[in-house]
């Protein structure tokens, strides 16, 4: 099964489970969790079921295309369901079966790995899913997002697209993966991987990046004062990516690193609070009424 077919199979499966299929969000981010389709939608009582593939940029992980499985940019297939279904783990195993992986014939383990994203004020109960000794998925029940307690609980399934495809295609090197017939992962991404690694470690203008971080931080705060959650959150994401670029260049000390993460976290918490208040003011319109009573 090539990578393109694998993604389409996951999309079809989760669509059948009631998830809407979205396109990736168009601002740089380090993980699919940071998309507003997860971060914001996990806040408050309104139900939400969605799936999307998310390119995730992690500058410090770039290896110029020379490492078989560490990348400046990788892909995640993200599934979020709120409230979390009681049978979410069974649904996940069903998705593997659709990919031709019979749980009865493979060693599939849920290894406890509670999750935290300090820069966004997020935390949850979590497990890594290991398939025959290889981690392929992160499974999380959100307890806190943007410093706010999550109720109802949102379940998040994050498939590592390249890792899962490497297992299915029995490839040792991600660049040897078949994206679709006659086209390899290398054909599409190798040059970008090499050049982005060069940028992240060698040529980025750190003075400019330091200025950009401050500028993005101010703009995020200004948009929140206007009550504009989504523009503000875009600039929080830009702060996060800019910090990651600075971190990759090694220009941020240990003390400064904690300070930068704290600044991003403060912005994320303000966004979360503002978003909750804006939805509350609207009466949480996506909450369904059953028998004349609100179902929360």
Swiss-Prot record:
Tetramer of two alpha and two beta subunits. Its main location: cytoplasm. Pfam families: tRNA-synt_2e. It is found in: Cytoplasm. This is Glycine--tRNA ligase alpha subunit. GO terms for biological process: glycyl-tRNA aminoacylation. NCBIfam families: glyQ, PRK09348.1. It catalyses: tRNA(Gly) + glycine + ATP = glycyl-tRNA(Gly) + AMP + diphosphate. Its EC number is 6.1.1.14. InterPro entries: aa-tRNA-synth_II/BPL/LPL, Gly-tRNA-synth_heterodimer, Gly-tRNA_ligase_asu. Belongs to the class-II aminoacyl-tRNA synthetase family. Keywords: Aminoacyl-tRNA synthetase, ATP-binding, Cytoplasm, Ligase, Nucleotide-binding, Protein biosynthesis. GO terms for cellular component: cytosol. The keyword Calcium does not apply.
């Amino acid at each position: 099964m090539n990578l393109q077919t694998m993604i389409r199979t996951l999309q079809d499966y989760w669509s059948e489970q009631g998830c809407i299929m979205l396109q990736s969000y168009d601002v740089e981010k380090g993980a699919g969790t940071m998309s507003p389709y997860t971060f914001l939608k996990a806040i408050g009582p309104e139900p939400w079921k969605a799936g999307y593939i998310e390119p995730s940029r992690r500058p410090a992980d770039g290896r110029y295309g020379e490492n078989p499985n560490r990348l400046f940019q990788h892909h995640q297939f993200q599934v979020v369901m709120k409230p979390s279904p009681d049978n979410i783990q069974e649904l996940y195993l069903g998705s593997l079966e659709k990919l031709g992986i019979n749980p009865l014939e493979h060693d599939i383990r849920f290894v406890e790995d509670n999750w935290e994203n300090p820069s966004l004020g997020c935390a949850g109960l979590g497990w890594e899913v290991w398939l025959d000794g290889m981690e392929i998925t992160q499974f999380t029940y959100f307890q806190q997002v943007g410093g706010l307690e999550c109720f109802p609980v949102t379940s998040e399934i994050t498939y590592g697209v390249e890792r899962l495809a490497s297992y299915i295609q029995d490839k040792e090197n991600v660049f040897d993966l078949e994206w679709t017939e006659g086209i390899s992962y290398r054909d599409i991404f190798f040059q970008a991987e090499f050049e982005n690694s060069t940028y992240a470690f060698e040529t980025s203008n750190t003075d400019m990046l330091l200025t950009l971080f401050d500028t993005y931080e101010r703009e995020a705060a200004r948009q929140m004062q206007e009550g504009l959650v989504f523009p503000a959150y875009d600039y929080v994401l830009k702060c996060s990516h800019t910090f990651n670029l600075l971190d990759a260049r090694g220009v941020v000390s240990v003390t400064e690193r904690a300070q930068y993460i704290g600044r991003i976290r403060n912005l994320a918490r303000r966004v979360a609070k503002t978003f909750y208040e804006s939805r509350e003011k609207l009466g949480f319109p996506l909450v369904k009424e059953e028998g004349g009573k609100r179902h929360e």
